[in-house]
Amino acid sequence: MRFFRPCFIAGWLYRDAIFRIRTTEKLLCLTFDDGPDPDSTPQLLDILDTHSIKALFFCDGRAAEKYPDLINRIISKGHIIGNHGYSHLNGWITSLKSYVTDVSNAAPFTSSRLFRPPYGRLRFNQYRKLKGNYKVVFWDIMPYDFDRSFGSRNSLRVLKKKLRRGSIIVLHDTKNSTLQDFLTGFIDFSTGKGYSFILPEEIFCF
């Protein structure tokens, strides 16, 4: 079974975390996880630039260290880089000390105090430890673009069906992501419905 939105219990447990923009307007935020990737990120940046959209990138620390030129390009285009950990750890099976250390190791490659837990998996003691230094950001819609077996048509269908005011959308600028096949179509669909993609700094305080 696939879950396109976080479980409601997560919103109750992580009460100070962000899952959605609080707004009555037709505003959206695009976020991208697990990059940068030389085969995906440059094309993604071109698409965002064409549509004058600024986005939030939660970069894998190892990839950020490996591709500093891509990190610099993301920042130069006016996007924001959040912390996604250095080693993409699963919080459910990682000790508090190891998890916090991994987040700290990724900090030099970020440009904000925003953090998204890899896989969305975060134990409460980890959350409690991190929230003093970071604003934890989850998402409102995840269309499984990272899973090629799901397919780009299904990803686009999910986005169209689940889209609502204030949606924070998580996509992936990785080698296996299908986002290149549907992102432009999704942007055109959203703007055609009167939605605007807003700058991350207009949503988050950090």
What would you call each of these model-derived segments?
Residues 50-76:
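A short, conserved beta-to-alpha structural element at the edge of catalytic cores
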Residues 159-201:
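Catalytic grooves of carbohydrate-active enzymes
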Residues 45-54, 58, 79-80, 86-89, ...:
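CE4/NodB-like, metal-dependent polysaccharide N-deacetylase domain
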Residues 121, 127-160, 195-206:
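His/Asp/Glu-enriched short active-site or ligand-binding loop at hydrolase and phosphoryl-transfer sites
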Residues 49, 75, 130-131, 191:
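Anion (oxyanion) recognition and catalysis
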Residues 35-39, 58-67, 89-97, 116-123, ...:
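Acidic-and-aromatic substrate-binding clefts and catalytic sites of carbohydrate-active enzymes
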